[in-house]
Curated annotation (Swiss-Prot):
Pfam families: EF-hand_5 (PF13202), EF-hand_7 (PF13499). Gene3D superfamilies: EF-hand. A motif (Prevents secretion from ER) lies at residues 312-315. It comes from Salmo salar (Atlantic salmon). Residues 68-103, 104-139, 151-186, 188-223, 229-264, 265-300 form the EF-hand domain. This is Calumenin-A. It is found in: Endoplasmic reticulum membrane; Golgi apparatus; Secreted; Melanosome. Residues 1-19 form the signal peptide. It comes from the Eukaryota. Involved in regulation of vitamin K-dependent carboxylation of multiple N-terminal glutamate residues. Seems to inhibit gamma-carboxylase ggcx. Binds 7 calcium ions with a low affinity. Its main location: endoplasmic reticulum. The keyword Signal applies. Keywords: Calcium, Endoplasmic reticulum, Glycoprotein, Golgi apparatus, Membrane, Metal-binding, Repeat, Sarcoplasmic reticulum, Secreted, Signal. Belongs to the CREC family.
């Protein structure tokens, strides 16, 4: 069974506390790049292969005949068409690509699911999660390990409620994924910021000052010389993090720090696919248009090929 969200946080804190004091703690969340290659279709579709297949799976895709791959691409187009109107929009393409990006996250959730779905009803209630995660700890009101499990449980419950969009205290697979990986969901960003500020804001004033900011990432020891990157982070705080120059970061500034608005590679790829394939320029793609541009789409992760194109039982 894997370590749970706040228990994981405490475990990481222990590791950090015992690590070398010059090691930097990273809190910034970035989307993983679609590929390490340059995106240059004039030179081939290597970027698209890596981005949508994954580098390991790309070779298995090469084993399929063009005819079979094209047939399976047609099946996948129907999956991308979320509203089943016979067309694939840019929004649907972006959603599919983002889902492919999160494949490793869904696999992680699948591994944990059976641990929490105690009654095997295909859902996970807050009670199930609480009992599995905290049951043994709550039996001892005064544990000798120094952790406040009541506080940890309260924070987990708050996050669970935020992920539970229909407010029924029961999580389906997508809601549980948002609970375990809140940084991946727009509606969970506020809770990520709140939890981060609670962790770093030691004086409880609702802000993160320079000392708290540095103290979170650098474990100073008296006789150790401060590493160069700490001075760089002090400058980063003053010049870029603290936008209104009041000497501290509020929630908005903290969000800009830990959840930066990076370039949306999935959106750019979706726009690229539509632009290259939309022969009648109506802003959406028919199945025929996609299959006519077979080479482009086979080389794009809009198909999550690593699994979808070589998994025979789904076709």
């Amino acid at each position: 069974m894997e370590i749970r969200p706040l228990l994981m946080c405490f475990a990481l804190c222990v590791v950090y506390a015992t690590s070398k004091p010059t090691e930097k703690k990273e809190r910034i969340h970035h989307d993983a790049p679609l590929s390490s290659r340059e995106h240059d279709d004039a030179q081939g579709f290597d970027y698209d292969h890596d981005a949508f297949l994954g580098q390991k799976e790309a070779k298995s895709f090469d084993d399929l005949s063009p005819e079979e791959s094209k047939r399976r691409l047609g099946v996948i187009v129907e999956k991308i068409d979320g509203d089943s109107d016979g067309f694939v929009t840019e929004v649907e393409l972006r959603a599919w690509i983002k889902k492919a990006q999160k494949k490793y996250i869904y696999e992680n959730v699948d591994r944990q699911w059976k641990d929490f779905d105690v009654n095997n009803d295909g859902m996970i209630s807050w009670e199930e999660y609480r009992n599995v995660t905290y049951g043994t700890y709550l039996d001892d009101p005064e544990p000798d390990d120094g952790y406040n499990y009541q506080h940890m449980m309260a924070r987990d419950e708050r996050r669970f409620k935020m992920a539970d969009q229909n407010r029924d205290q029961i999580a389906n697979k997508e809601e549980f994924t948002a609970f375990l990986h809140p940084e991946e969901y727009d509606h969970m960003k506020d809770i990520v910021v709140l939890e981060t500020m609670e962790d770093i804001d030691k004086n409880g004033d609702g802000f993160i000052d320079l000392n708290e900011y540095i103290g979170d990432m650098y474990n100073h020891e008296d006789e150790m010389e401060e590493p160069d990157w700490v001075a760089t982070e002090r400058e980063q705080f003053s010049e870029f993090r603290d936008k209104n120059k009041d000497g501290k970061m509020d929630r908005e500034e903290t969000m800009d720090w830990i959840l930066p608005s990076d370039y949306d590679h999935a959106e750019a790829e979706a726009k690229h696919l539509v632009y290259e394939s939309d022969s009648n320029k109506d802003g959406k793609l028919s199945k025929e248009e996609i299959l006519n541009k077979y080479d482009l789409f086979v080389g794009s992760q809009a198909t999550d090929f690593g699994e979808a194109l070589v998994r025979h039982d789904e076709f």
